[in-house]
């Protein structure tokens, strides 16, 4: 078996209530399939927990994680954490398998998955621990997030906030008349020109980041592009919010961004409605391909970001 699809040592390849398999379109992230009966019981368990309760009471989010682990076992939780921390993989996809179309169930399932990894960050854009947003034909926002027909360039999350952003979760809530718009992922170790930028004199020099007005974050953060973390070589970058101070820095950042976009290691991944993806934010960059123009285009997504509990 290829080293990139070898399962982490403590992970059992097949369990009665869940199955781990290679992702059909990405050579690193894995696909997790859960027994639908166990998943249906979890949805019944959380039926009377309302979303506002989750927004107001942080421990209820962890309670959802406990309820999911009760149905699927500690091995399931250990597997998810290990997948995201393992540099060979660093992420997974999982979904509700058409068991529900209720957005509240999507929030609860995504919250349970995220809080198996650890606590979520406050999302200043939405004012709570997650953000839901719609991409459609027209948009007048001040960032690429909702702009359907632009390339949403490769980036990491959490660049302009002081909170640790260890993991990122994105879940598809709805989609109509959408062609294109695939998620794009780049693992640092698959970027052919990485070392050219790491070894540049600006590669580890701090840059300032400042979010746009819609992000509702006033602080300005200074951080290097490349750095060492517990996961090895790591990156923090977003072209929209980094603030170069001269033409040399501008040329370097522009070349870095263009190199990532053109890399053969940048792969497209599609999600079904009710599906989600989790990535390690230290060594994955992510973006989105442009949609094909359609006046009736709608895609709704949920974002959660957080830190590892252990």
Where does each model-flagged region fall?
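Active-site environment of non-heme Fe oxygenases that use a 2-His-1-carboxylate facial triad
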Residues: 2-72, 76, 86-91, 132-273, ...
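N-terminal functional module of multi-domain proteins
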Residues: 73-120
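Long, hydrophobic, well-ordered secondary-structure blocks that form the structural core
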Residues: 100-147, 153
């Amino acid at each position: 078996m290829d080293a990139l699809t070898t399962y982490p040592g403590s992970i059992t390849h097949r369990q009665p209530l869940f199955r781990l398999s290679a992702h059909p379109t990405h050579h690193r992230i894995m696909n997790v399939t859960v027994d639908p009966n166990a998943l249906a019981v979890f949805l019944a368990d959380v039926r009377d927990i309302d979303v506002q309760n989750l927004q107001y009471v942080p421990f209820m989010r962890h309670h959802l994680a406990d309820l999911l682990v009760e149905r699927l076992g500690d091995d399931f939780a250990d597997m998810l954490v290990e997948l995201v921390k393992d540099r060979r993989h660093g992420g997974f996809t999982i979904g509700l398998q058409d068991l529900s179309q209720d957005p509240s169930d999507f929030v609860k399932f995504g919250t349970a998955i995220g809080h198996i990894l650890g606590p979520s960050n406050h999302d200043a854009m939405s004012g709570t621990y997650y953000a839901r947003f719609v991409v459609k034909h027209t948009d007048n926002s001040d960032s690429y997030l909702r702009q359907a027909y632009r390339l949403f360039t490769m980036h990491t999350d959490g660049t302009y906030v002081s909170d640790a952003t260890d993991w990122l979760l994105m879940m598809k809530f709805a989609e109509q008349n959408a062609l294109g718009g695939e998620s794009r992922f780049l693992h640092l170790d698959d970027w052919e020109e990485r070392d050219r930028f790491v070894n540049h004199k600006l590669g580890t020099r701090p840059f300032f980041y400042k979010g746009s007005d819609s992000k509702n974050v006033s602080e300005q953060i200074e951080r290097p592009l490349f750095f060492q973390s517990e996961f090895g070589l790591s990156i923090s970058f977003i072209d929209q919010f980094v603030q170069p101070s001269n033409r040399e820095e501008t040329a370097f950042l522009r070349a870095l961004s263009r190199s990532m976009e053109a890399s053969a290691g940048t792969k497209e991944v599609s999600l079904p409605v009710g599906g989600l993806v989790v990535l390690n934010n230290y060594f994955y960059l992510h973006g989105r391909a442009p949609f094909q123009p359609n006046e009736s285009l709608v895609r709704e997504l949920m974002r959660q970001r957080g830190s590892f509990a252990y």
